[in-house]
Amino acid sequence: MRIVRARFVAAIVLLTMSAAAHADDYSLDDVAIVTSLATYRARHVDVVGAALSRDDALKLLAVGGASSAAEGLAKIDAARISIPELVSETRAGDFAQTTVYHDVAIERVAHGVADSVAAAGLTIESRRGAETAKGRFGALHAEGVDFPAAARMTLEQRTSPDQPKQQIMATLSLLDIRIDVPDGGGLAVDRLTGRNFGGRPLAASMSGLVELAPRPGQPPDARTQQAVAAMISDLLASIDIGALEMDGLQIKTGAAADNSEAPGAMKARHVALAGVADGKVASFTMEGIDSAGPADAFHIDRIALSGFDARPAFAADVGAGARAAPHFDHAEIAGASIAADGAPVSIGAITVDARDWMDLTPTSLVARAEHIVTSLTGAGVRRSPQLAALGYDRLDLSAALDLNLDRDKHELSLNDLSLRDDAVGGVRLSGVFGHVSPDLFSGVEDRMRNALLSIVVWRAALRLENRGALDRYVDALAKANGMTPAVMRGKLAATARAMALALFTTRPDPRADVVAQAASAFVDGARTFDLSLAAPQGVGAIDLMMAGQLGVLMDKLKIDANAK
């Protein structure tokens, strides 16, 4: 859509040069202008109050070319320029696009900057091979349009890596956007508004993006993929947007030829971006999201992102074999519900704070999920038949993850990894791990596996919490075996003690007895069980995997346990 707007701006201002007259009114018929990006045609152009003479305008038009367009546009002064129909045609290889603008009006142009630009609507048809996509747009209105700056961005190449950006458009409003793609999918927006659009020329010509676009059914080769990624990364870094909002967004996905699923749709009541600069997005929100496609229908009240940066993913594509993901500082989902084949799931809130990113993952992460509620009745029984058998009709889960990597010390702190249901119980893990290589976060399988095997454990802790599930289990087991709950609990406590001893020792050891007593007490009615392990010299991941019993490592461990 940015390219469409840029072409629109460039087309309008180039045509004005052929119709301007010195402080007078002129008309011109059958205008055709050729640029490196497209060919523009207009059957009729009316110019009112032009300061530039007709002869001078024709001279500027004759010079043409990307190198002189911006300078020529800066000489345009006119009270009003009207174009009933403007046609833009772009061709590159087997790609062709035709855009038709209707009833274009440009008001109060001074030195190439217009107070306002409006069009009653426009249509787009793009063809590549046998594939055709079509778009229809309603009324367009823009203010503070800097035509010379737009020409520099769309027709020129960057002269230096740090070339400053210029504001191209102060405000934009576009109504009734409808785009249809060949597979039956499409996009619709009731209203799009934005402000403070800026940019600079790309390192390579913008027309190169069109030439490099993949062909239908022909995945790009590695070299083309890297070139496209480099240009997209440059484009993201070369465009600024103060704010952009969409109302009534609808994305329709069509069925592929080998997919029997019917088309589906995702709708959003409101979408907003703010602070888009240097490839980063300060904030992004999407509200009132609904999907009723062939998969499970869902609703989300709100999705929000801040500090979003997509450039690392494209930069990774430039390097052979590299992998990376977009980065963000904060993400949240609020008020979600999923139909899930008759077993609905709802989510109160999920928040994620991420810092100190490597290629694929952050090395500082705090995530929270509250009130993930799922039914255990009807079709929901399959989610946990064991809990359903104990009489639970739903789960209401909360979860947490808190970790941090100290790159200087190569030390990973797992501060919290937990899951809890206030009516069932909970589990929490924490620990400190050493010799943690950055390769663990690389996303490259071999490097991640080797890094995992190199880790040593300094400290680890486990907490189990009984909020009722263990009591229900004891009662159910007692009933099934014709015992009282007290007798059954005693048997289970003895079993827990024996299992703890078998896990922690190959010979009598008072430290193992402490663990066994705590495990027995937990089963016998205590609400919490805490186990902590400390290894002053560190225990390697390989040692843990090869040890048949923790008792083999007892001399390296400090163990404590209690139940309350």
Language model regions located:
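N-terminal signal peptide c-region/cleavage motif recognized by signal peptidases
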Residues: 16-20
